[in-house]
Each structure stands twice: as C-alpha cells, then as structure tokens.
C-alpha cells in the first residue's frame, strides 16, 4: 500500500471492563459511607454542621468510623522480619501493636499535650434527606386520634407499579436496561443494545387518599441563666430534628414555639433557635402559656396536642408543686406530654424529682447526658406504636 493510501488512524482493542473499575470502587465506597452513617446515626444527628445548617440540602459531616485507606508507617521502633511460618490463613491478623501491654503515649486529649499522631477521619458530603430517611423511618406521633369535627383527607401519590406502556417522562431506565440485557443475553450476545419496544418499562402511580387529623406541637424551652451553651445546644438540636420530622411526615401539623425563664412568651422559630436570654427559672410560667394557647387557638376537640418541654431541671423549688399540677392539667387536654432534661453530670434535679411521681402513661421523660441522647430521646418520644396510623 502506498504512503498516500495509508490510513491516518489506528484501530486498537482495549479491555473496557478496566474502565469500570473506578465506578465500581466508587459505588463500594458510597455503600460503606451509607453503612457508616446508619451505624453512627446517634452521633451524627448532633453534628454542629447539621444543626446550624438551617436545613441546607448538603452538609459535610465527619465519619470517624470510616478509614481512608493509605500506607502507614509502623511507629513501633522494634525490628521486624517479613517471613511467616506458613500457617497463615485468609483473615488472620498479621500485625499487632508491639507494645506488649505497656502504656503508650498518644495524641493530646483534654488537658496536656500528647506526642502521637492524631486520629484521621473521613469527611463526607451527606444530604439532609439521606439522614432524614434513616432517622425518621420508625418515628410517628404517638396516640394520634381522628377528631370528630375534622374530616381532612390527604391525597398522596405513590409510584408503586411498573408497566410496559406509559409517559416517556416516567420511563424506568434501570429496569429497561436490565430487560434489554436479559433478552440480548438469551440470544447469545450479552449487551444493553439494541433496546426493543418490548424492553421498555414505565413507572406508574396510584392516588392514595389518607385520613388526616390535625395536630399541634408546643415546643417549650428553658432559656434561663442556668441553661448553659451546651444545654441550649442539646435542646435546640432536639427541636431542630423534631420540626424537620413533623414537616416531613405530616402535612397538617402546627408548631408553636415558647421560650421561658421566669416568664414565658410565644416567639418566632428564628428567635427560638437563635436568641439567648438569662434570668431565673419558673417553669410553671411556660405551662400556663401552653394552656392559654390551647384555650384560645387549639381546641382538644379539633386538635391532637403534644407539648414538649426541655430544661436543665433547675427550677425554683417552691414552684415544683405548681408545675406538677399544671402538667396534670395539660395531660387532660393532650395526647402526650414530653419532658426532656439536659443533665450532663447527673446532678440533683428539683424538677425531675417532682415529675418522677407522675404515673400517667401519657407522660414521657428522657434525661440527656451526651450528644447521642438527642437521637435516643427522639426515638423515645416518637416511637412507633401498634394500631392504626394516621399520617
């Protein structure tokens, strides 16, 4: 062939399966991230980047249980040889800390400086929606009842069926590709192409009418001087997730925000989550304000009512008997009363001492001692119950 007729291109054959290795590794990594999120959910829900995000779509959170693989030096100074005895099996531990049980110096924690390397952790971008799906899966408003006057019905659309015809906007690409691959494989050529009419799969929906009952949640928080930065952060973390849970799962739930010290007042959501106050503590003031709201706006005949009060338990001692009386009065009008006490050091609580004598099954309390307890408090207050669910 003359030089003029020489082609100006080359044809090469390449193993394209190698090009998918990166995608496969990425998928495995994402699966590990999701598993780590699921296993560390109690610690993740109180991460400051989430609570202070104002509900942004994506946030960065540290996942300390997920290692980022890399070659590490052995910091033990002893000499080693690399030959085994031939008895090793898959899964055997081949390297251990050579300290022999001796106390090792470590990274600095608290007071004092350490001389060892710090612990690396993986920082992942996670959507709030992913956390909500994992967190809210088993939560519901307890004792939710259908009110006599209220006949609201919620129209809900569920994509729960696959058909061979439908709108092109609803085509299920994954199922279509799988169907084409199976058909081509049966003909001796495992490939995603060509795609025939018989391979097409479309998602279709059904309109579901669900009975709905109105509800109101009274979010009450102690903002007195005894509530320190950590106590207020814990209380606001709980109410942050509570409001997102209610607005995600229920379409007709009102939320009233009440802050108190010696006096109680209804505040906006922004003020509730950002404004700091001081002063003494008279918890009965917030219960009086809650009863006033119920009498003026939220009749028990039309609303399911859920008061939630968070405090550090440091109340004026002479006010405790009045608090118990008002809580019992509230429970006559409410479906459930929840009290959360932020008590990190297990100190004596005048308010909890009084509340422990309340025997009503609709009174629930939870003592929060560490950040993970926000997750457990949500599970305790909003646990799923047997019987008819109304959402």
UniProtKB/Swiss-Prot annotation:
It holds the Pfam family DUF444. Residues 21-31 have a biased composition (Basic and acidic residues). InterPro entries: Spore_YhbH, UPF0229. Residues 1-31, 80-117 are annotated as: Disordered. Residues 98-115 have a biased composition (Gly residues). Residues 1-16 have a biased composition (Polar residues). Signal peptide: none annotated. HAMAP family: UPF0229 (MF_01232). Belongs to the UPF0229 family. PANTHER family: UPF0229 PROTEIN YEAH. This is UPF0229 protein BcerKBAB4_0466. It comes from Bacillus mycoides (strain KBAB4) (Bacillus weihenstephanensis). The lineage of its organism: Bacteria, Bacillati, Bacillota, Bacilli, Bacillales.
């Amino acid at each position: 062939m003359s030089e003029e007729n020489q082609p100006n291109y080359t044809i090469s054959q390449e193993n394209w399966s190698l090009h998918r290795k990166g995608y496969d590794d990425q998928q495995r990594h994402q699966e590990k991230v999701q598993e780590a999120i699921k296993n560390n959910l109690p610690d993740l829900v109180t991460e400051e980047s989430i609570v202070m995000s104002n509900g942004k779509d994506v946030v960065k959170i540290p996942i300390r249980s997920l290692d980022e693989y890399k070659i590490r030096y052995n910091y033990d100074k002893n000499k080693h040889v690399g030959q085994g005895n031939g008895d090793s099996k898959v899964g055997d531990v081949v390297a251990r800390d050579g300290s022999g049980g001796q106390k090792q110096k470590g990274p600095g924690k608290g007071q004092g400086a350490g001389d060892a390397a710090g612990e690396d952790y993986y920082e992942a971008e996670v959507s709030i929606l992913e956390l909500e799906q994992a967190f809210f899966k088993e939560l519901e408003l307890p004792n939710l009842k259908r009110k006599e006057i209220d006949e609201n019905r919620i129209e809900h659309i569920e994509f729960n069926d696959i058909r061979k015809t439908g709108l092109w906007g609803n085509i299920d690409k994954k199922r279509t590709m799988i169907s084409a691959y199976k058909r081509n494989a049966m003909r001796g050529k495992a490939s995603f192409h060509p795609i025939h009419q018989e391979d097409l799969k479309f998602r279709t929906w059904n309109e579901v009418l669900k009975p709905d009952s109105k509800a109101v949640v009274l979010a009450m928080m102690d903002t007195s001087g005894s509530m320190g930065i950590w106590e207020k952060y814990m209380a606001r973390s709980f109410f942050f997730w509570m409001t997102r849970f209610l607005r995600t799962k229920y379409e007709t739930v009102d939320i009233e925000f009440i802050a108190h010290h010696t006096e109680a007042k209804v505040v906006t959501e922004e003020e509730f989550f950002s404004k700091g106050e001081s002063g003494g503590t008279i918890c009965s003031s917030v219960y009086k304000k809650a009863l006033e709201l119920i009498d003026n706006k939220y009749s028990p005949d039309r609303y399911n009512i859920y008061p939630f009060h968070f405090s550090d338990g440091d109340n004026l001692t002479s006010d405790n008997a009045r608090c118990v009386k008002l809580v019992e009065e509230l429970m006559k009008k409410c479906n459930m009363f929840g009290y959360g006490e932020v008590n990190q050091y297990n100190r004596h609580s005048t308010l909890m001492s009084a509340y422990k004598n309340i025997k009503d099954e609709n009174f629930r309390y939870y003592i929060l001692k560490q950040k993970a307890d926000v997750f457990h408090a949500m599970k305790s207050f909003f646990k799923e119950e047997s019987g008819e669910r109304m959402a």
